[in-house]
């Protein structure tokens, strides 16, 4: 990553994207020129598409409700079917139900509290070039995405026999140079070393879209999930359904 990129706090800029009355057009325009333009437009469009899902599992609540029927939230999603891993159900149907708004807001706050008992998975409903629906799995903590664009970047690097760490990762071991930026940061819990992915080389619309809402501020996340819902938050309190979700993601990717 070059020196100019190293002094930019992307997550701080993301956190200013939403004002009290909605998206700040000036900040959006600024971000438009900070990233490849088509990539940024696609990332921002995803946030309004109702194709992005955040599946949240609260381990503590899962234990307490293990023998109970979950009546807090009607997820309207059959996780036992691979076709419904990323359902086309609109965000309003799930996020804005009278009996689930408070529950959703509670989980949104927890997503920013670094709660070890709270786990979440990021999945995007997507169709491949042959028309087959294949869910895209995104992992911000390890900067991974199962989409074709991300896979192609990695494939080209491997074919060129390049070292992936040297090509994509910057290591910072000088404490005085540590950053507050969380965009592209991996293994963030280390106290002696910071690792950042070179997002100029390794970035796709899915990673960018989830970074905007999960590596910025609760206000931005709330805007895109509750106020102008385009991202669907689905709480899961059954460990069985949580495991089914993972099994179906793996099964779909193998297909």
From Swiss-Prot:
Signal sequence residues: none
GO biological process terms on file: DNA recombinase assembly; maintenance of rDNA
Coiled coil: none
One of the record's GO cellular component terms: Shu complex
Subcellular location: Nucleus
Keywords: DNA damage, DNA recombination, DNA repair, Nucleus
UniProt superkingdom: Eukaryota
Cited function: Plays a role in a RAD51/RAD54-dependent homologous recombination repair (HRR) pathway to repair MMS-induced lesions during S-phase. Required for error-free repair of spontaneous and induced DNA lesions to protect the genome from mutation.
Annotated family: Belongs to the SHU2 family.
Protein name: Suppressor of hydroxyurea sensitivity protein 2
The organism of origin for this protein: Candida glabrata (strain ATCC 2001 / BCRC 20586 / JCM 3761 / NBRC 0622 / NRRL Y-65 / CBS 138)
Organism classification: Eukaryota, Fungi, Dikarya, Ascomycota, Saccharomycotina
């Amino acid at each position: 990553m070059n020196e100019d990129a190293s002094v930019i706090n992307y997550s701080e800029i993301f956190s200013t994207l939403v004002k009290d009355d909605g998206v700040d057009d000036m900040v959006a325009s600024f971000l438009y020129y900070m990233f490849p333009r088509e990539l940024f437009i696609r990332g921002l469009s995803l946030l309004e598409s109702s194709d992005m899902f955040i599946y949240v599992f609260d381990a503590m609540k899962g234990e307490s409700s293990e023998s109970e029927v979950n009546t807090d939230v009607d997820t309207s999603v059959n996780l036992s079917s691979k076709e419904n891993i990323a359902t086309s159900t609109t965000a309003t149907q799930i996020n804005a139900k009278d009996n689930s708004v408070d529950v959703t807001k509670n989980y949104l706050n927890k997503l920013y509290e670094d709660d070890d008992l709270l786990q979440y998975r990021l999945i995007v409903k997507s169709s491949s070039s042959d028309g087959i629906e294949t869910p895209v799995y995104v992992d911000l903590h390890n900067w991974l995405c199962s989409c074709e664009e991300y896979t192609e970047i990695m494939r080209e690097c491997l074919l060129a026999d390049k070292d992936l760490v040297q090509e994509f990762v910057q290591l910072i071991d000088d404490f005085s140079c540590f950053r507050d930026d969380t965009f592209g940061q991996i293994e963030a819990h280390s106290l002696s070393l910071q690792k950042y992915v070179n997002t100029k080389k390794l970035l796709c619309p899915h990673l960018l879209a989830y970074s905007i809402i999960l590596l910025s501020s609760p206000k931005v996340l709330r805007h895109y999930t509750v106020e102008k819902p385009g991202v669907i938050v689905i709480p899961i309190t059954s460990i069985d359904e949580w495991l089914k979700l993972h099994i179906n993601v793996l099964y779909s990717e193998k297909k």
